[in-house]
Curated annotation (Swiss-Prot):
This is U3 small nucleolar RNA-associated protein 25. GO terms for molecular function: rRNA binding; U3 snoRNA binding. Residues 1-133 are annotated as: Disordered. SUPFAM superfamilies: P-loop containing nucleoside triphosphate hydrolases. InterPro entries: P-loop_NTPase, UTP25, UTP25_C, UTP25_NTPase-like. Pfam families: Utp25_C (PF06862), UTP25_NTPase-like (PF22916). The gene is utp25. It comes from Aspergillus clavatus (strain ATCC 1007 / CBS 513.65 / DSM 816 / NCTC 3887 / NRRL 1 / QM 1276 / 107). Belongs to the UTP25 family. Component of the ribosomal small subunit (SSU) processome composed of at least 40 protein subunits and snoRNA U3.
Length: 693
């Protein structure tokens, strides 16, 4: 499917006010607007009701504190921008960064909320010693938290391991303070024991009428505000996980909001009382979702709305117009996981603020006026790391209490550096006060301990060293954390070919991860490539020695091998093609055709290209894995290339697969050969070659 250049955007057709800007959520242009603090930026992310809302310019906490004081101050008048339609064609664009970061303004609706708290919610606005929301955020003792923070910073954790009947390996860890129990929690079979807002009880049960075994294992930690790394996400359980996390995120936002409003009303009623109400952070946003595509964002929003069931959704049409697209029908033959990830709008540049009121969800709210932020890593980093240092801002992340990173394996194929950047800027002390009422801020925020109270949940189809680094570095929850990984049967046992294929694994020595690329290249050129070149150059029938596909996971390794083929005397007489995620489409087609026809004896092929395109390469007679794929599904897909030409499938099966690995590939190797085999292959001293048929 052809993708638009840049980050598409324009106005939707139902705009009725000049108060809208022409910029939407999702733009990659240079951000040129005025400084977000010094001047009132042009308002993009607003709906028609914003004329009532944008009056005071005071941040959320101060707003709620002063509502009953009947403040009449007016903020600066908003600039007006003409709405332009470009031939009626709609694009999806991001607003200038300042529009997303505009400071919050007052709302008549919020004032009504001080008076109008649902009767059914009265009872669950009080602190409850059995509610994890209260025990985790409000009732924790300072000494307990400080001891846990110190133990975590000293890397002192105690753990418990267990394998479930469904084949899930669980490892739970808590900071080792000399107290506490790291035992695994009992599975959660339904929502009857979950402390949800009463208005969510019915929708939650409807969303997830029956939990799967894996969901039952994870739910106690999710609703108990512990960190979770779930490494068994797949197309079968992704929808249930998404609904489960949406229920948790919505519940957290509603409890936070209603507690603040109730305490605010109490302050108004007891003005002479010396109340110590610690119920807020520095800024309003409390939940951060990091997602791979706009369509993934729409699916999360759909789960949230089915859970919250708002009477009104502001800017919903704009959301659907700019974030959602129908699936590409030409992809019906693509693998299921590919269709799930890239189906619909696969733009990976977006950000969206969600604001909740009692009966309404507003989309495209400014970040400082939002309860939830949903964004791609690229979209969020763009707003945080602007070229103009004065316009950089991450204070809106200072009070995030729940982080949900969904489909992390897809984010890995984008740019993991953006994830690291965002996580490193979470829960930092804000550089500006933003009108914060510090008398209402929780003490652990003031003590700079928020990162140890924050909950982080990451779901992924498989776990990589990058994700393990997040688990050890950023998952520092004082309540503990859990990692869940499947027991792997091994991708080698699931190759979709009608005949047996010889699959050989060659181990090479590598002293450190940093030296691994050099050791791999040396082993490849001296052992694998020398044998391959010898067969190609010594054979009289050139057509019989062609068809070698070299699969290379890393783009840096791809460049190194490609340059070696192009310049080395070793490969002077070897014709080859090379295609990667950066290769022009026309050049890709030419290289694949030459390879299929035998004009190229060798084709270099990267993992990221396969991730984004899922090509079926014809003409493959043997496969060399320079390194094993991160995604175990790719193993079967690539090995199946050997069977695409029915006439030569037996010959191709004899050519087989040869894969290189070192001890630093343990996680990949486990997914390919299986959990039971990986240990012996890494430790075996009697040889370094392992063959499976």
């Amino acid at each position: 499917m052809k993708r638009k250049n840049g980050f598409p955007s324009s106005r939707v057709e139902d705009i009725e006010s000049d108060d809208f800007s022409e910029d939407g959520v999702g733009d990659d242009r240079q951000f040129e607007d005025d400084d977000m603090v010094d001047e009132a930026p042009e308002d993009d992310v607003s709906s028609e009701s914003d004329d009532e809302e944008q009056q005071t310019g005071r941040p959320y906490n101060e707003l709620l504190q002063l509502l009953q004081a009947n403040t009449e101050s007016k903020g600066p008048a908003r600039k007006k921008r003409k709405v332009e339609h470009n031939g009626g064609e709609k694009e999806d664009a991001l607003p200038p960064a300042e529009d997303d970061l505009e400071e919050p303004e007052s709302s008549d609706e919020e004032e009504d909320l001080v008076e109008e708290v649902d009767d059914q919610d009265e009872s669950d606005d009080e602190e409850d010693a059995n509610d994890p929301f209260d025990t985790h955020f409000s009732m924790v003792e300072e000494s307990e938290l400080s001891n846990a923070v110190k133990a975590a910073s000293d890397k002192k954790w105690k753990s418990t391991k267990k394998e479930t009947a469904s084949g899930l390996k669980l490892v739970r860890s808590i900071p080792d303070t000399g107290e506490g129990d790291a035992s695994l929690l009992p599975p959660l079979k339904n929502f009857s024991s979950v402390k949800l807002k009463k208005k969510l009880d019915g929708p939650a049960a409807d969303l997830i009428p029956a939990m799967s075994d894996d969901a039952q294992q994870l739910a106690p930690y999710i609703f108990g505000y512990q960190d979770v790394l779930h490494g068994a996400r797949n197309t079968s359980n992704s929808a249930t996980l998404r609904d489960l996390l949406a229920i948790h995120a919505t519940n957290h936002v509603l409890k936070t909001r209603d507690r603040v409003l109730k305490n605010n009303a109490r302050v108004a009623k007891e003005q002479d009382a010396d109340l110590d109400l610690r119920d807020q952070g520095f800024t309003r946003p409390k939940v951060l979702y990091l997602l791979p595509t706009r369509q993934a964002c729409v699916r999360v929003v759909d789960s949230i709305t089915r859970c919250f069931q708002p009477e009104q959704q502001e800017n919903k049409k704009r959301l659907l117009d700019t974030f959602s697209r129908p699936d590409d029908k030409s992809w019906e033959t693509k693998p299921e996981d590919f269709r799930e990830l890239f189906g619909g709008n696969d733009d990976d540049m977006f950000r969206l603020g969600l604001k909740f009121t009692r009966k309404t969800i507003k989309y495209f709210a400014q970040f400082y006026n939002s309860d939830m932020i949903l964004a791609s890593p690229l979209g969020l980093r763009t707003i945080m790391d602007q070229a103009d240092a004065k316009k950089r801002d991450h204070d809106f992340l200072s009070s995030i209490e729940v982080v949900i990173v969904d489909h992390a394996d897809a984010l890995l194929m984008q740019n993991w550096d953006h994830i690291d950047y965002i996580l490193n800027h979470l829960n930092l002390q804000p550089r500006q006060a933003h009108g914060c009422d510090f008398s209402r801020v929780r003490t652990w925020y003031l003590d700079n301990q928020a990162r140890s109270v924050r909950q982080m949940i990451m779901t992924t189809a498989f776990i990589t060293p990058e994700m393990n680094s997040v688990f050890s570095t950023h998952m520092q929850n004082y309540a503990g954390k859990i990692k869940a990984t499947p027991v792997y049967a091994g991708a080698i046992s699931e190759v979709p070919l009608p005949v047996s294929v010889k699959q050989t694994f060659s181990r090479f020595d590598s002293l450190t991860p940093t030296k691994d690329p050099d050791a791999r290249f040396k082993h490849f050129t001296t052992t694998v490539l020398s044998s391959l070149v010898r067969n190609i150059t010594s054979s009289r029938d050139k057509s019989s020695v062609g068809g070698t596909l070299i699969f290379i996971p890393s783009y840096l390794d791809f460049v190194r091998v490609r340059n070696h083929f192009a310049t080395s005397a070793q490969t002077t007489n070897v014709s080859f093609g090379a295609i990667s995620e950066y290769t022009d489409v026309r050049e890709m087609s030419r290289a694949r055709t030459h390879f299929m026809n035998g004009r190229h004896s060798v084709l270099l092929y990267t993992e990221r290209l396969h991730h984004f395109r899922r090509y079926r390469i014809r003409g493959v007679k043997r496969i060399v894995m320079y390194g094993m794929p991160e995604n175990p599904l790719f193993w079967g897909e690539i090995v199946s290339f050997l069977g695409l030409d029915e006439a030569g499938v037996v010959e191709a099966a004899e050519g087989g697969v040869r894969a290189l690995f070192s001890k630093w590939d343990a996680l990949k190797l486990e997914r390919i050969v299986g959990t039971k085999r990986v240990g012996n292959m890494l430790r075996e001293k009697g040889g370094d070659t392992f063959t499976f048929v």
